[in-house]
């Protein structure tokens, strides 16, 4: 059998790769060129720009202008030619004469599914393949091409997933740049406040010291002036006494009584008064401690902050990280710790030992939850929510059985109720609390809730909590007014002074 006409070699692999879009990894469809020189499918690059704040090239990140997209006719023609040649090559390959078997020189027309080898009719009768499943090459190739097509689809989907993940990392990087600038400003502002406070205290201390110095100087000047006048009076008296002693005896004796009274009335020198020196102890004694103690009155402290990295898209955390509002859903940068399907967030601290307490002002929020969540349970709930998709309710996993312990305000047909995460418990109180105190005893395994305004106990959970974080849910506000916040109450700081023994 003569071999068929030779087939011209197809395009090289590197050339084919140059005709693939960097976004979809398929041959270009309606190729367009950006100002930077990179080429993409028009639909692909437009899709990328829909999720970008500022349009840029998906490859080099150079800023792009959507109106400057230029259709690349040359590239489109090359892709069309390549696809046509590959189709013709595939048809010719199907018409070529089959290769002969090396052992029997017979046409290879069968395929062994067990050994994955090409066979001729003589090979099929061989003992090595007698019990094996074989089928015609054409049928096998068709089946394998279908499998490869599926694998190609899987790989393309995986490549798209990698590209989407890359865009997510780009969004995270940009978010971190903005966050870094914002954090730098906030940190500088906070330290500026401390420096301003210290400058004011320094100036007040210096002013007080200078005022005392001025008063003591005036006091010393007044005393020196009095002493100068008294010294001058004594000098005149001494001069007068010397003159009288030069008089004759009769005159001298006649003035004795008046002279004695006059000398008796002269002023005696007064002793030095205490407190004339500058009081160094008054200004330097524990100066730093006294200023720090005074600073506590102007410094606000909270048991923990609200973690914005866990806040769902509905929530906006205040700049001081102590309050949060529900302003409706807005797209946030992806983060595996972020709640995805319910308006929830966590506190910044992880508690596993000791006693901890905090107060939360829920005000008149129509729906809320306040409590703790086991760290591992939060990760598991996030994974289940991601598997469930967009329509899945993340909130359905938030109960005691799955590691969430909280009090909540819920809306029912017969009014609002204060409930717990344990669905077996009945509503707790008729009067809805506005300020909750939470007390966590890790070693005792107790989580207690109190109404801070009414000073009454509401409920206590008993469980082995493990590592937990504060947990909050914030429903949408009622009416058209501004959204009402949920706040972490500030601590009352006190100082206990003890001897260092």
From Swiss-Prot:
Disruption phenotype: Deletion mutants are more sensitive to viral infections with a dramatically increased viral load. A zinc finger (B box-type) spans 96-137. Widely expressed. Highly expressed in brain, heart, kidney, spleen, skeletal muscle, lung and thymus. Lower expression found in stomach, large intestine and bone marrow. This is E3 ubiquitin-protein ligase TRIM35. SMART domains: BBOX, PRY, RING, SPRY. It is an enzyme of class 2 (transferase). It comes from the Eukaryota. InterPro entries: B30.2/SPRY, B30.2/SPRY_sf, Butyrophylin_SPRY, ConA-like_dom_sf, PRY, SPRY_dom, TRIM/RBCC, Znf-RING_euk. Zn(2+) binds at residues 101, 104, 123, 129. The modification Phosphoserine is found at residue 8. PANTHER family: E3 UBIQUITIN-PROTEIN LIGASE TRIM. The RING finger domain and the coiled-coil region are required for the apoptosis-inducing activity. GO terms for cellular component: cytoplasm; nucleus. GO terms for molecular function: transferase activity; zinc ion binding. Keywords: Acetylation, Apoptosis, Coiled coil, Cytoplasm, Metal-binding, Nucleus, Phosphoprotein, Transferase, Ubl conjugation pathway, Zinc, Zinc-finger. It comes from Mus musculus (Mouse). It catalyses: S-ubiquitinyl-[E2 ubiquitin-conjugating enzyme]-L-cysteine + [acceptor protein]-L-lysine = [E2 ubiquitin-conjugating enzyme]-L-cysteine + N(6)-ubiquitinyl-[acceptor protein]-L-lysine. Pfam families: PRY, SPRY, zf-B_box, zf-RING_UBOX. PROSITE patterns: B302_SPRY (PS50188), ZF_BBOX (PS50119), ZF_RING_1 (PS00518), ZF_RING_2 (PS50089). The gene is Trim35. E3 ubiquitin-protein ligase that participates in multiple biological processes including cell death, glucose metabolism, and in particular, the innate immune response. Mediates 'Lys-63'-linked polyubiquitination of TRAF3 thereby promoting type I interferon production via RIG-I signaling pathway. Can also catalyze 'Lys-48'-linked polyubiquitination and proteasomal degradation of viral proteins such as influenza virus PB2. Acts as a negative feedback regulator of TLR7- and TLR9-triggered signaling. Pathway: Protein modification; protein ubiquitination. Belongs to the TRIM/RBCC family. Gene3D superfamilies: 2.60.120.920, Classic Zinc Finger, Zinc/RING finger domain, C3HC4 (zinc finger). Residues 200-252 form a coiled coil. A zinc finger (RING-type) spans 21-61.
């Amino acid at each position: 059998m003569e071999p068929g006409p030779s087939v011209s070699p197809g395009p090289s692999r590197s050339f084919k790769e140059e005709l693939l879009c960097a976004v979809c990894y398929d041959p270009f469809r309606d190729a367009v060129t950006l100002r930077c020189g990179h080429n993409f499918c028009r639909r692909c690059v437009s899709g990328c720009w829909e999720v970008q704040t500022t349009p840029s090239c998906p490859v080099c990140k150079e800023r792009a202008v959507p109106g400057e997209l230029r259709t690349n006719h040359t590239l489109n023609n090359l892709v069309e030619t390549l696809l046509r040649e590959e189709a013709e090559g595939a048809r010719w390959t199907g018409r070529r004469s089959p290769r002969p078997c090396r052992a029997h020189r017979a046409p290879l027309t069968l395929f062994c599914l067990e050994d994955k080898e090409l066979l001729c009719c003589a090979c099929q009768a061989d003992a090595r393949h007698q019990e094996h499943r074989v089928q015609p090459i054409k049928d096998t190739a068709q089946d394998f091409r279908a499998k490869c097509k599926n694998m190609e689809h899987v790989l393309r989907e995986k490549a798209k997933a990698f590209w989407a993940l890359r865009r997510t990392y780009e969004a995270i990087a940009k978010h971190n740049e903005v966050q870094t600038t914002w954090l730098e400003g906030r940190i500088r502002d906070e330290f500026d406040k401390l420096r301003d406070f210290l400058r004011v205290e320094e100036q007040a201390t210096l002013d007080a010291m200078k005022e005392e110095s001025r008063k003591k100087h005036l006091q010393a000047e007044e005393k020196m002036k009095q002493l100068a006048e008294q010294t001058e009076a004594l000098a005149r008296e001494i001069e007068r006494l010397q003159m009288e002693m030069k008089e004759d005896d009769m005159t001298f004796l006649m003035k004795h009584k008046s002279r004695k009274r006059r000398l008796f009335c002269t002023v005696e020198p007064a002793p030095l008064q205490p407190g004339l020196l500058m009081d160094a102890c008054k200004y330097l004694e524990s100066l730093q401690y006294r200023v720090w103690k005074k600073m506590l009155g102007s410094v606000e402290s909270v048991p923990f902050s609200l973690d914005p990295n866990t806040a769902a898209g509905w929530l906006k955390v205040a700049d001081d990280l102590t309050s949060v509002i529900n302003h409706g859903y807005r797209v946030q940068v992806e983060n595996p710790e972020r709640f995805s399907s319910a308006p929830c967030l966590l506190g910044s601290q992880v508690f596993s030992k000791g006693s901890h307490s905090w107060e939360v002002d829920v005000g008149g929020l129509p729906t809320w939850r306040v409590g703790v969540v086991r760290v591992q349970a939060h990760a598991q709930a996030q994974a289940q929510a991601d598997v469930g998709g967009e329509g899945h309710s993340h909130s359905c996993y938030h109960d005691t059985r799955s590691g969430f312990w909280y009090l909540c305000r819920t809306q029912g047909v017969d009014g609002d109720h204060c409930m717990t995460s344990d669905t077996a418990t009945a509503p707790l109180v008729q009067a809805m609390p506005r300020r909750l105190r939470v007390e966590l005893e890790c070693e005792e395994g107790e989580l207690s809730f109190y109404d801070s305004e009414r000073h009454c106990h509401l409920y206590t959970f008993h469980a082995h909590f493990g590592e937990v974080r504060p947990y909050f849910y914030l429903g949408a506000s009622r009416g058209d007014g501004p959204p009402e916040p949920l706040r972490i109450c500030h601590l009352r700081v006190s100082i206990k002074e003890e001897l260092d023994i």
